[in-house]
C-alpha cells in the first residue's frame, strides 16, 4: 500500500481576516415618546348627537373604537355604549372582563 499524501487545501481568493479591530461603541437611542391624546371627558351637544347618529352604524363597536373615532376618553365611551344598549341601538356580541364587543342592532 502506498503512503497517504496530505491534501493541502487550495489557496482561497479571499484575503485572510485580520484580528478583531476595535468597533465603534453603540450609542443609546432616545426612547420614543408617545403622543398625548387630548380626549374629551364630558360630552358636548355636537359630539353627543354624532354618537347617537353615527355609532349605531358602525359594524364593530368597542370602547376603544368609540374613544378613537369620537375623541372621547375610555370611561365616557363605556357610558355611551351602556346608553346605546339601553336605547336598543346596538347589541352585545361578546363580553369579557377586559373587552366588550358590540355591533349594530338588526331586526333579528
Swiss-Prot record:
Annotated Gene Ontology cellular component terms: cytosolic ribosome; cytosolic small ribosomal subunit; plant-type vacuole; plasmodesma; vacuole
MF annotations from Gene Ontology: mRNA binding; structural constituent of ribosome
Membrane spanning residue stretches: none
Region of interest called Disordered, as start-end residue ranges on this chain: 1-36
InterPro entries: Ribosomal_eS25
A matching Pfam family: Ribosomal_S25
Alphabetic keyword roster: Ribonucleoprotein, Ribosomal protein
Bias type Basic residues, positions: 22-31
Family per record: Belongs to the eukaryotic ribosomal protein eS25 family.
This protein's name: Small ribosomal subunit protein eS25y
Organism: Arabidopsis thaliana (Mouse-ear cress)
This protein's encoding gene: RPS25B
